[in-house]
């Protein structure tokens, strides 16, 4: 159903967000320039919609995408439940669920979800920041009706 597909795509976005948090923090710790790191990811096979949007507000420092950890936790929890109900033995999903559960306990339910990066920054005493990135992502594309998912045959 459409709601199951939405939960699945939100799960994928969350996995990308956590991977980006780890990658950006590792590059910062290695002394790489964050603007160069952003561009290197953007032009590579490691790019994603999540990188092009959420990495910018991470590197700005605002981390404001108007989506909070409690909402992420709800979606990834629903995905994990869907897998369990269908006897799919996942490994990454339970880890992501645990990471966000711990982050919510540490930072609060209403903390912006990109602040998952704090789990990596704080133990190292780092701030993963670049220059010239926007403090919010603005969707200025005109409203459209939704799309029907039509499988390729």
Description of each model-found segment:
Residues 2-123:
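Helical "substrate-binding/catalytic lid" subdomain
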